[in-house]
Amino acid sequence: MNERFLIEIEGLNKTFDDGFVSVRDINLKIKKGEFITILGPSGCGKTTTLRLLAGFEDPTYGKIKVNGLDIKDLPIHKRPFATVFQDYALFSHLTVYKNIAYGLKAMYTKLDPIDKLVEQYHQSLLDKQHRLHKRIERLEKSNANPQLLEQLKQTVVVQQKQFKQQTETFKQKENARRDAIQQRLVQLTKEWESLSKQKLQQLEAEKKLLDKKFEQTERKYQKDAWMATHSEMRLKQFKQEVLALKQLIKTKFKQNEPVDKLQLKLQTLKQKYAAKRQIDKEYDKLVLAYNKKDYWTSYWETYSLQQQEAFEKRYLSRKLTKQEQHQKVCAVIELVGLKGNEDKLPEELSGGMKQRVALARSLVIEPDILLLDEPLSALDAKVRKNLQKELQKIHQQSGLTFILVTHDQEEALVLSNRIVVMNEGNILQVGSPADIYDSPKTEWIANFIGQANIFKGTYLGDLKIKLHSGEVIKTDVDNNYVVGKEYKILIRPEDFDIVPKNKGFFNVRVIDKTYKGLLWKITTKLVDDTIVDLESVNDIEVDKTFGVTFDPIDVHLMEV
């Protein structure tokens, strides 16, 4: 049975005008209700990925599917996302209550069920009767205008006889009206789907023609060896190479050394780049044309759905009443812990409170997916930890899909169902917090997530590894390692146990120590000068030698 995913990112790329590639053809699938954290250092592409999802940036190419439909070209307000920003972005002149309620002004809900409308109509007739009875009572007390009094009494009798019939007539009319709307919607949906199918077939044929032109243009690059190896060269890199050659020619000339070959190389570089630029222009035109086709493909793929939503919004929906808005605002204020602060302005709030308001404002509009752009990074440590717990609680209670962007490894490990590790625009690993921390795929990930001790060794078979320093250790993880192949071995500092000298797997000598409150960070050396960091609850003197042990489950092998 195929798994259902709420979000599917396919081959997503973002290349800026200066040629910088921020997001490199990434692929990611997210299930409904997950808490996903995109983790990485500054400049890794995580925030750009979030902005692409939200619609604040347009991708160079690739797809962003939600419930199977590509939404990358949908405007921001039509996407099923809400975003919580790092800088809060609150309205300074509005109270907490009004900031949260702001998005509800444009929110629609389905029309009330017919039975409820009939009940409301029934009540309006009762209210009308009640007002007539009150008027009759006043006239009877005053003994004024007996003729009018008699007319009103007759009116009450007539209305009572017609009461049931009026209610039934109203119900029949409302049923007939809604049936007609539904029939019209079914008819229009068929027309919209037929039109979109026709347009998509036409676009597919046009894309195939463009694909052939792409192949022809790419063959032009391959005809020349220089172009084949420099097809990605940008103007900035070309200028740098020209300047470097000119500087070298100038230096050689001053030293009375021959420069003919360098001048020829410079001239050839300019000619080759000029020829390449002509092909680049052809290629760029094709990319522009293809992107336009891709835009319209995305448009027509969602055309029928958008038309249905617009139709339902107009004929089968209504705006929220003030009472409904108030109920939603009060519920979300309770959820995020803002009760008692409804009438305060943002300037009267702490950073943590402001972030709660920003979170509440996003939650109140009931998005399918909540995007969190480093919302806790500007807060102090204690407030941040408290809000982390609040986020976990809100995620569990709301059942929404959360996508958090952060560079804080601890935050990612604490909050997430799954972590997406990014660097230089690439997704390096996707997994549970335990997988990412305990079984990183690369040395870079191991060092980025927490502290890591990396050893080099050779796999001997039978789950045994021989370290370069000569010691033989064991792992209990069998991942089809190749006998005789060199691997990098990860052991976390907290996984070491300190034992007396010569009683462990190997001995280490203390070269430094740092007190960290609950623990001491002890820096040691192996006999081959390999640095080993470990943790101890007790202070250990510098230059002391002792043994260390660890469990095989804590030994993780990585490709070199």
UniProtKB/Swiss-Prot annotation:
Assembly with partners or alone: The complex is composed of two ATP-binding proteins (PotA), two transmembrane proteins (PotB and PotC) and a solute-binding protein (PotD).
Keyword terms, alphabetized: ATP-binding, Cell membrane, Membrane, Nucleotide-binding, Translocase, Transport
Cell membrane in keyword set: yes
An example Gene Ontology CC term for this record: plasma membrane
Gene3D superfamilies to which the protein is assigned, alphabetical: 2.40.50.100, P-loop containing nucleotide triphosphate hydrolases
InterPro entries registered for this protein in UniProt: AAA+_ATPase (IPR003593), ABC_SmlMolc_Importer (IPR050093), ABC_transporter-like_ATP-bd (IPR003439), ABC_transporter-like_CS (IPR017871), Mo/tungstate-bd_C_term_dom (IPR008995), P-loop_NTPase (IPR027417)
Family the entry assigns: Belongs to the ABC transporter superfamily. Spermidine/putrescine importer (TC 3.A.1.11.1) family.
Protein name: Spermidine/putrescine import ATP-binding protein PotA
Enzyme Commission number: 7.6.2.11
Keyword set includes Cell membrane: yes
Membrane-protein topology: Peripheral membrane protein
Function per UniProt: Part of the ABC transporter complex PotABCD involved in spermidine/putrescine import. Responsible for energy coupling to the transport system.
